[in-house]
Amino acid sequence: MQFTDVHNIYSDSRSKVALQRIKEVLNVEKPDLVIITGDIIYGKPAEEGFREVLGLVSDFQIPFGITFGNHDDEQGMTRKQLFDIASSFEYNLTTTAEGVSGFSNYILTVRSNDNTKDAAILYCMDSNTYSTIKNIEGYGFINFDQIEWYRENSKKFTSANGGNPVQSFAFFHIPIPEYSYAVEDQNAVMTGTRMEQVCAPKLNSGMFAAMKEMGDIKGIFVGHDHDNDYAVYWNNILLAYGRYTGGNTVYNHLSNGARVIELSEDGTSFTTWITLEKGERINKAVCPDDFIKD
């Protein structure tokens, strides 16, 4: 399950609906894993607000991981400090690769039912904050060393699987530029809601190209754009937004909820949908079957 953009502010009544929805959706779906793709907090005190969200998930005794968004370290604590707080929770799976840009680059492996092999690989990545390139404004991007980290690990999993790529999925906060290319492609099939333009970085650092080169990524799941929850199938990869999870501490025009991703062990397909208030499920789709034009 993916939560995104909780934008929690501790002791702010506008965040109450976000915390309620997290609890409600967890009760309904009972997921095996939760990944929160950034912008978890949106005000001070940072530690209390951060602990409130992670503690809520942890209390369900569900393993969880996080990736950072561009607003998380704007509330008086650094990514490293927030990472250390996350590490204090019993059910936290978040780690970070040493020597790689960011503080939430890690891999989660999903084992086969008989526990003999890796059935799926989840790449969780820090999409960073804002551009650090001179004269280039806007949002940050996945850096070259992060892309190389992904490529090298992908090669290892493929090699261990007899030269066949293992079905893999990527989770991070800021959408890559290909989200814009995909919705402009009239041949690409889309499901869900698109109410704002893609707020991607101005520079394309090549993450999608690396994914195509490795041949393992089946789906990408991001947040950042609160009024989008669509999924579009482009060049054999599903580019999907999570559903905005937050309350009214920041702009939003969609009722809040979560995205659910259900994997199949054989890797031929996966199913995804949005879960809302009272367990309502919408936009259920099987990928790739429901995204192929007749």
Question: Which residues does each PLM region occupy?
Answer:
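Active-site environment of divalent metal-dependent phosphoester hydrolases
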Residues: 9-11, 42-45, 66-77, 130-133, ...
